[in-house]
Amino acid sequence: NVFDKIKSVGLAETCKRVFWKVAFKGLRLRNKKMQQFVDENLKVSNQQYNEHDTADSNKYYDTYICGSDQIWNPDLVPTDSMYWLPFVEKGKNKIAYAPSFGASTVTEKQKEQIKANLSTFKAVSCRENSGARTINQIIGEKKCEAVLDPTMLIERDYWDTISEDKIYDEKYIFAYMLRGTAAQRKYIEKIARERNLKIVSIPFLDYEKIDPYDLKFGDYKLWDANPAEFISAIRHAEYVFCDSFHCIVFSILYHRPFFVFPKVGADGKVKKSQISRMTDLLELAEIKNRILLDNEEADLDAEIDWNNSDKRIQKARCDSERYLEQALFM
């Protein structure tokens, strides 16, 4: 029986096995719902290419756009990866839209490879000012400009058509922690108790790192959330706590009060490259005092000038659209 099994392997091992079973079930469901979302909402080619046959696409396409997010982060992706479009034939139009460098430092060898890669692009942009500066330093001229993340090119009305209806009737805090710490989650629980709010969370799942603390964190866990449910969870929250760039994006688009925990490394120190992505976005929207550093308390009643934020994002949206139009048609 179950007690004999616990005795044979130990309580700790039994709990560990139960956790992984729950986590991987959630991961499988999430992947299934994600694919369903893609099938229903994205227009994709009938042919699915991989690294071995991407060159065949030159028969059908004249323009290639790579982006966005951290596709050019040398800490995550090799500088000879497919994200630099090495398979595209000479004379074709290669455009980079809003890739992110992510890394705060780039080695001299990486710089040489990056410079060679960029020489074949017609137009280059980055998602962050810091990334644009890095590229301009590498190539020695100001050809790279900062543009909006693609999710911000689209106004809120469109995302309303994608979003699910309100998932929970009760008032809640939405928590989305890609990594985070137990202390950060406990702080969110403290806020929830003080404000008499529930916690809706999306546990972070991948095949390498799953935080066991997520198993008991939150009143409602969206193990299998798809993008429509992710947007809905932000859209209807009383407060949002996160360490995610895109969670900040949708909090801004939907005018939700949000607070950001900076990501920390294994040494417990804040990752400067990660926080720069967030500070660039907050500076663009002129939103202050949202990143919680050094156990800083959140000012839950601090107001945000959303009207000013919207105007600044709209201007950046127009500038980003202009960049794309010029890259595509001039």
Task: Enumerate the language-model features and the residues they cover.
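Active-site anion-handling motifs in enzyme catalytic cores
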Residues: N1-M330
